[in-house]
Regions:
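Glycine- and Gly-Pro-enriched alpha-helical subdomains that act as flexible
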Residues: 95-98, 105-137
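Conserved small/polar residues in nucleotide/adenosyl-binding loops
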Residues: 140-141
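Solvent-exposed alpha-helical segments within well-ordered globular domains of core cellular machineries
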Residues: 34-41, 45, 84, 114, ...
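Short flexible coil/turn linkers enriched for glycine and charged/polar residues
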Residues: 21, 50, 90-92, 133
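C-terminal regulatory domains involved in ligand/effector binding and gene-expression control
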Residues: 1-76
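Ordered, amphipathic secondary-structure segments that act as subunit-interaction surfaces
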Residues: 66, 73-105
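Short beta-strand/turn micro-motifs at beta-sheet edges
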Residues: 11-15, 83-86, 127-128
Length: 141
């Protein structure tokens, strides 16, 4: 068991507008993959009319579970940048869904990578970062 790890304090949402495309990052703490999948399904239902609902999550003490999806965006331009934000901060037990409403202007692969990555970062900043420490408590009688 790790003595300390990084996660988020709360669930949160943040929004970014990039060339008329609207990006909504929703972030939530998750305990396991089933909880992450339920959260993703909830966001897809909430934002059913969105162009894309991209996700990434990282779960486990040693990040044993890492998943991401581009949800129809060009390969590697959406889910990977979101996962990279989680990996870069070593943020565990966290799921991020970035919803995109297309604004009519193509962003290009570099623009997509930057927009999805920035959206995820804004969502995590809004949620707040927490350091979790495990302690042993001994009781003598």
């Amino acid at each position: 068991m790790l003595d300390e790890y990084t996660t988020i304090l709360n669930g949160a949402e943040a929004e970014l507008i990039e060339k008329k495309s609207r990006f909504i990052a929703t972030v939530r703490p998750v305990k396991d993959e089933n909880e992450a999948k339920a959260f993703i399904a909830e966001m897809r239902k909430k934002y059913w009319d969105a162009t894309h609902n991209v996700f990434a999550y990282q779960i486990g003490e040693r990040n044993e579970i890492q998943r991401s999806s581009d949800d129809g965006e060009p390969q590697g331009t959406a889910g990977k940048p979101v996962l990279d934000v989680l990996m870069g901060g070593d943020i565990k037990n966290t799921a991020v869904v970035v919803t995109r409403y297309f604004g009519g202007t193509l962003l290009g692969t570099g623009g997509l990578v930057r927009a999805y990555g920035r959206s995820a970062k804004l969502g995590i900043e809004e949620a707040g970062i927490a350091k979790v420490r495990h302690y042993n408590c001994l009781l003598y009688t």
